[in-house]
Amino acid sequence: MKKILTPLAKKLRNNSTDAEKHLWYSLRGENLGFKFRRQAVIGRYIVDFVCFEKRLIIELDGGQHAHNLKDDQRTRWLNAQGFDVLRFWDNDVLRNRDGVLQKIIERLHLPLPIPPHKGEGIEPRV
């Protein structure tokens, strides 16, 4: 799966939305004290931004994401892998980047959740 998604992730990085570009400017280079990657492959998904150290994913949504069932499934799967997912509307990033960054900073300074004990994940073995 990763071999298929990696070229797509690179294409997405090269064709970022305005909101992604604005937020990346603030996240890159450890500007917030933590390293972020953009358009990163995690399992069968490509996430907009991820901080592996804090197990935090940031997703930016345009109008096409107005309560999408696939987004809910994706978030549940990412949560099951130990990631917290913050979602912001593109317009929020473009109009209130400081407010969005404040929410991200608050989350970055929370302690990491305790991972489930081995064998207690919600994904059944096949």
Summary of predicted features, one role per range:
Residues E30-G33, A80-G82:
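Alpha-helix termination/capping residues and helix-transition junctions
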Residues K35-R38:
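A short linear hydrophobic-aromatic micro-motif
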Residues M1-L32, P111-H117, G121-V126:
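Solvent-exposed, charged helical/coil patches
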Residues L12, S16, G43-L108:
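Basic, amphipathic alpha-helical patches used to engage nucleic acids or provide basic targeting signals
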